[in-house]
From Swiss-Prot:
Record key words, sorted: ATP-binding, Cytoplasm, DNA damage, DNA recombination, DNA repair, DNA-binding, Nucleotide-binding, SOS response
Binding site for ATP: 77-84
Family: Belongs to the RecA family.
Pfam families given in the database record: RecA (PF00154), RecA_C (PF21096)
GO molecular function, one term: ATP hydrolysis activity
Gene: recA
GO terms classed as biological process: DNA recombination; DNA repair; SOS response
PANTHER family reported in the protein's UniProt record: MITOCHONDRIAL DNA REPAIR PROTEIN RECA HOMOLOG-RELATED, RECA
Location relative to the cell: Cytoplasm
NCBIfam families listed in its UniProt record: tigrfam_recA
Keyword flag Nucleotidyltransferase: no
Function (record text): Can catalyze the hydrolysis of ATP in the presence of single-stranded DNA, the ATP-dependent uptake of single-stranded DNA by duplex DNA, and the ATP-dependent hybridization of homologous single-stranded DNAs. It interacts with LexA causing its activation and leading to its autocatalytic cleavage.
A GO cellular-component term linked to this record: cytosol
Protein name: Protein RecA
Species whose genome carries this gene: Corynebacterium diphtheriae (strain ATCC 700971 / NCTC 13129 / Biotype gravis)
Length: 372
C-alpha cells in the first residue's frame, strides 16, 4: 500500500515568510487594485470628520462634534419626541457647509414649511416619496454611490413597506420581509457610504414585544441588522413640556447615545425644542457654558467675561440669538474645554503630558548636605 501524501501546506520559515507575504500582497494588488490590503500604520488617516447636529449639547454627546461622515446613524424614540427635527437640523448644517442633502420621505409626512423654519434650504433639498421599501432603499443606494451626497435621511424604517406586502391582501402574513430587506440594503450601502463619506440617518419607531416580564419591552422595527450596522444609535425622548404661563411653547428633550463606535457611548444631551422654531442652540450653549464655568451664574443673572448677559435664561437665550457672533465664541470655548471636534488633538497632547514618566517620579530630596 502506497504511503499517503501529506496534503498539509508547508509553513515558510525565516525570510521565506516575508517573501511569501510580499508575493501574496503583490498578487492581491494586481487582481484587486492598490490599497486592497494595507498595513494600518502605513496610511495617515485623518480624524473622523462629522456633520454638526446644529446643537452644542448633541455635538458634545456624540463626542466628535456631530454625526460621523461615512457611517450609518439610527435615531429612534416614541412618537413626537423630536426624531425628525434632529435629522432636519443635521441637514440644515450640512447645507450651510456647502453640502448636498437628500430626504427619503417614506412616511409621506415631510412638512416643507417646518423644515424651512429649521434652516433647511428646501429649494436645494432632494426629496423622494417612494411607493415601496425596495424603491426607497434603491434610490438611497444610487444617491450614495453618486458620491455627491453629504447626508441622506430615511424617514422612517417602519414605513419601508416591502412590495409584496403592498401588493398583497390586508390580512396576508409577511413575516420577516422587512428585516430581510433592511439586511440586504445595509450590506450593499455600508461600503458605499464609507467610500463616499456620506452620512446616512435612519429614523426608526418603537414597538413593544409581547410577553416580556423582565427588562424593557421596547424594540425598534426592521429587524436587528440596523442595530449592528449603525455606528451611532440615539434614543430621543421628550421629558418635559416647556410653558409660558399656561401655554405650551416647547419640549425639554433628552438624547442618549446608546451606541457609539467613534467615541465613548452612553453620553446624554438635554436640549429644548421650541414649537415652530426647532432645537434651541442658545439654550444648550447657556447650560453647557454654566456647567463648564465659561458663563457665570449668580442668582438669576448670567455673566460672561465680566459682562452681564441678562437676567433669566429666556432673556439670555434671546440675547444670544440676536448676537450669533457671541454665541459662536462661547460655543467654541465649550468645545475647547471638552476637547470636541477640532480640539480633540488637544486632549491627546494633554494625555501625553500626563503620561510623561518624569511626572511619575516621586518627590525625593537629593540635597547631600548634612542636617547637623
Amino acid at each position: 500500500m502506497a504511503p499517503r501524501k501529506n496534503s498539509k501546506t508547508q509553513q515558510p520559515t525565516g525570510d521565506n515568510r516575508k517573501k511569501a507575504l510580499d508575493a501574496a500582497l503583490a498578487m492581491i494588488e494586481k487582481d484587486f487594485g492598490k490599497g486592497a490590503v494595507m498595513r494600518l500604520g502605513d496610511e495617515n488617516r485623518p480624524p473622523i470628520s462629522a456633520i454638526s447636529s446644529g446643537n452644542t449639547a448633541i455635538d458634545v454627546a456624540l463626542g466628535i462634534g456631530g454625526f460621523p461622515r461615512g457611517r450609518i446613524v439610527e435615531v429612534y424614540g416614541p412618537e413626537s419626541s423630536g426624531k425628525t427635527t434632529v435629522a432636519l437640523h443635521a441637514i440644515a448644517q450640512a447645507q450651510k457647509a456647502g453640502g448636498i442633502a437628500a430626504f427619503i420621505d417614506a412616511e409621506h409626512a415631510l412638512d416643507p414649511d417646518y423644515a424651512r423654519k429649521l434652516g433647511v434650504d428646501t429649494d436645494a433639498l432632494l426629496v423622494s416619496q417612494p411607493d415601496t421599501g425596495e424603491q426607497a432603499l434603491e434610490i438611497a443606494d444610487m444617491l450614495v454611490r453618486s458620491g455627491a451626497i453629504d447626508i441622506i435621511v430615511i424617514d422612517s424604517v417602519a414605513a419601508l413597506t416591502p412590495k409584496a406586502e403592498i401588493e398583497g391582501e390586508m390580512g396576508d402574513s409577511h413575516v420577516g420581509l422587512q428585516a430581510r430587506l433592511m439586511s440586504q440594503a445595509l450590506r450593499k450601502m455600508t461600503g458605499a457610504l464609507y467610500n463616499s463619506g456620506t452620512t446616512a440617518i435612519f429614523i426608526n419607531q418603537l414597538r413593544e414585544k409581547i410577553g416580556v416580564m423582565f427588562g424593557s419591552p421596547e424594540t425598534t422595527t426592521g429587524g436587528k441588522a440596523l442595530k449592528f450596522y449603525a455606528s451611532v444609535r440615539c434614543d430621543v425622548r421628550r421629558i418635559q413640556t416647556l410653558k409660558d404661563g399656561q401655554d405650551a411653547i416647547g419640549n425639554r428633550t433628552r438624547l442618549k447615545v446608546v451606541k457609539n463606535k467613534v467615541s465613548p457611548p452612553f453620553k446624554i444631551a438635554e436640549f429644548d425644542i421650541m414649537y415652530g422654531e426647532g432645537i434651541s442652540r442658545e439654550s444648550s450653549i447657556i447650560d453647557l457654558g454654566v456647567d463648564n464655568g465659561i458663563i457665570k451664574k449668580s442668582g438669576s443673572w448670567f455673566t460672561y467675561e465680566g459682562d452681564q448677559l441678562g437676567q433669566g435664561k429666556e432673556k439670555v437665550r434671546l440675547y444670544l440669538k440676536e448676537t450669533p457672533e457671541l454665541a459662536d465664541e462661547i460655543e467654541d470655548k465649550i468645545f475647547r474645554a471638552l476637547h470636541i471636534g477640532k480640539y480633540a488633538a488637544l486632549k491627546d497632547a494633554d494625555d501625553a503630558l500626563t503620561d510623561d514618566p518624569v511626572d511619575m517620579v516621586p518627590n525625593v530630596d537629593f540635597d547631600d548636605s548634612d542636617d547637623d
